[in-house]
């Protein structure tokens, strides 16, 4: 009976196991913990039921405690091990992420900063190239030498956009995230792995930036003419013989002999007007890219009248190395361009002090002839090496540092660059009056450089009740310079003085003159004494460059001069621009020259002024 009950229980237990086994074939996703617990519980129950010995129970309890302790140890050990691994992996992952993002940021910034800087330079300074930029960077700039508005505009239009786009690509959000998200969607279709997609999204940003970099640097290279700069400054240069063929070195002794025959030497007063074009006197509104509130014929009415009543040569063209202020001044005074600054010429102080020291320029000629010379400008003369250039060629400088004390007697005497032009002309008037009062006077050669019409333009509210705009700055300056010329022509000095008005270069104000317009630099010779009558056929339909003006300046005060440097007197012969053509002359001027490099050498026979 007892055996029958045991067998019955055994069958019942066996049936239960079979049932569980059968149902297990239809169940899925049991955890290892659940399976282990079931097995341990089943084995323990079975063992207790079948056990007939009391000594087995302690052994069973001991085994149970050992199993439980091992389970607890395993649970405690696994998190500690994973925590330890995560601690080791965290710095590595952080370092990798940091350098990955830093790479994206630096790559982006090196792409966008040169691009936006080039756009800013061309907006405010026109079609400049890398030669001009490096040239200015190699000279010290005084704290008051640059208008603070230019610094703010550079930060706003070049630096901040570069930083913003670089950060957007480094930490995608908003518009930048759309690009990354669209890439991730496409990549997910083919890669299926989130980790691969995430790594490829970083690669996508690098690829995207690389494509932009190719476009950006190609734009920068073309606009700034970087390849031409590298070619002209490489170690093993191919020198051209252009200067050897066309440069006519001024013969000071010969000029002295011609000067000695003049009974009464004439004076010379030159006014270099910032960005002044003959184009501004056009009656055709189609020449301009803007609309202004007054007829274009009235924009520079006084200057138009002075050019008509005096002697004015048609079509002074701007060629290579003459398109910014110091380059224009060098070209007018030395009859060669400022094409590049040789790296073997030295840096900063040496170049600034001995600027084109071995070249013979207009100042050297007048110094040899015994003229009194002076240069007047309202801005700081240290900018772009201007002070060093004129000191190297015997012309003393009167700039912001010497004029500002006088200017403080005027209300609102400053413009964007220093002392405004109306105050500068007032200073020059007093200087000329003091000179006229002298008993023993030398002949003089004085030079004045204006700044009100430098882009984006300064409107002198004391003279013109007009809103600030570039067109209004031209109109207001026209009134200021017209009053000064009228005063001078009524002064006792006018009779023996040739007054010359020259634009220093074409305007740098973008989108003011139509690109299709034939542009030329303003010039007017008032009361000249040319050695050959300037008939109409010698004045019209001509093609002159800055270089030809040097010979004309000497000839206008009765010193016969057929050529000077690369300049040719258009009253006597055809200019190089007319002989070679504009494109050929520009190409030749861009080539390295041994003669030009020698101009930068130190001349021990000269004295600095």
Feature roles, as predicted:
Residues 13-16, 24, 103:
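Residue-identity detector for glycine
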Residues 228-258:
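Short coil-to-helix leader/linker segments, especially the first N-terminal amphipathic alpha-helix
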Residues 251-609:
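Solvent-exposed soluble domains appended to multi-pass membrane proteins
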Residues 1-13, 40-41, 62-68, 75-83, ...:
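Intrinsically disordered, low-complexity segments used as extracellular stalks/linkers
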Residues 57-60, 85-232:
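Transmembrane and membrane-interface helices of multi-pass
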Residues 18, 30-33, 39, 45-48, ...:
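Intrinsically disordered, low-complexity segments enriched in serine/proline and basic residues
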